[in-house]
A protein has these predicted regions:
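Active-site-adjacent betaalpha module
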Residues: 2-4, 30-41, 58-195
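Short beta-strand segments at enzyme active-site cores
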Residues: 7-8, 44-50, 135
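Short acidic, Gly/Ser-rich segments with clustered Asp/Glu that frequently serve as metal-coordination loops
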Residues: 13-16
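A short alpha/beta connector and helix-capping loop motif
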Residues: 19-47
Length: 195
């Protein structure tokens, strides 16, 4: 299994803008933790940044402070930066070609929003033959209230995670994922040493 971590849309809009992420607690801390764990295990990190090209959209406008990556993400090393204009990170980007070139077979989903760009990107990955590990507490969402109804952030997060686990992704916590990648590296080292 050869992984790449996709850090989806961790932009200021979700912290100080119009779309504040409210659930789960610790979402940013967990995103940073998986970025650091991936770096320590030489797992490639792909940072995805959303841009709306339409000037009438009230958020994700290139060049605005809210469009910028969160400083903690921007300050960490990554292997590829992808800019996208639609919810799916594969649409209109070089992501798939880069993953194939790197011989990646598994993508790990972290970032925002669970119900929109993370969910869409995970589904696109499955349709392209990739395995998906969907980080349950390193993704995040917010409550919705629109003409179709309303749903709390907790309910929305739980529903998407349950749907992902059904036939699409392996839903896994940050703690379990970090332990998994560390154990696999240790096992490979022991095998190389003939232990």
């Amino acid at each position: 299994m050869t992984r790449a971590l996709l850090v989806v849309d961790v932009q200021n809009e979700y912290f100080s803008g119009l779309l504040p992420i409210t659930h789960p607690q610790g979402h940013l801390t967990n995103i940073l933790r998986v970025m650091d764990a991936a770096a320590a295990q030489a797992i490639p990190r792909v940072v995805v940044q959303h841009t709306f090209p339409q000037p009438d959209k009230p958020f994700f406008q290139r060049g605005t402070p809210q469009w910028e990556l969160h400083p903690e993400v921007r300050g960490r090393p990554h292997d590829l930066l992808i800019e996208k204009n639609l919810p799916g990170s594969f649409t209109g980007t070089a992501l798939e070609a880069w993953l194939r070139q790197q011989r990646i077979d598994t993508v790990v989903i972290a970032g925002y929003m669970t119900h929109m760009c993370c969910d869409t990107t995970a589904r696109q990955a499955v349709h392209r033959g990739f395995k998906v590990e969907f980080l349950s507490d390193a993704t995040g969402t917010l409550p919705l209230n629109n003409s179709a109804g309303q749903v709390s952030a907790e309910e929305l997060q739980r529903a998407i995670l349950c749907a992902q686990q059904m036939l699409l992704s392996e839903v896994i916590s940050t703690e379990a994922w970090c332990r998994r990648i560390t154990q696999r590296t240790q096992a490979r080292m022991r095998a190389a040493l003939g232990q």
